[in-house]
Amino acid sequence: MSKAVKILLVNGPNLNLLGRREPGHYGHHTLAQIVEQLKLLAGEQGASLDHIQSNAEHELIDAIHQSDADFIIINPAAFTHTSVALRDALLGVAIPFIEVHLSNVHAREAFRHHSYFSDKAVGVICGLGEQGYRYALDSAIARVRAAQEK
């Protein structure tokens, strides 16, 4: 029997404002509501989900460094376009990850089109709202289970 799958969900700056910040781009649910639903979905699949949200880059880096997760789902938010340090943290721990964005970053301002993460991510999901997190969770669990069966 395969071991339980551990997922780390990392959310970057300003995502604590979900539900009130630009709901046209980011939706009406709070981050707490989204995370609660993801934890339930993970549990239904025999997986666990830990979560961190921070507006401080070093806190996200520390959480990644300390993680024993099998897979990371990350919405780096504004750090997408600026953080070599967060990229290096992900590469340093060598935990596979999926990059998620609630809005379609390619349909927004030009500065949002560049990501320091996309070229190293297993996959990138953007523009699908909170459903993107669910797709990432399903994919992460499936990928870990497939690797465990090898």
UniProtKB/Swiss-Prot annotation:
Keywords: Amino-acid biosynthesis, Aromatic amino acid biosynthesis, Lyase
Site (Transition state stabilizer): R21
Alphabetical list of CDD domains matching this protein: DHQase_II
Catalytic residues (positions): Y26, H101
Pathway(s) served: Metabolic intermediate biosynthesis; chorismate biosynthesis; chorismate from D-erythrose 4-phosphate and phosphoenolpyruvate: step 3/7
A molecular-function term among this protein's GO annotations: 3-dehydroquinate dehydratase activity
Enzyme class name: lyase
Binding site for substrate: N75, H81, D88, L102, S103, R112
Subunit structure comment from the entry: Homododecamer.
Protein name (record): 3-dehydroquinate dehydratase
Species for this entry: Shewanella loihica (strain ATCC BAA-1088 / PV-4)
Gene: aroQ
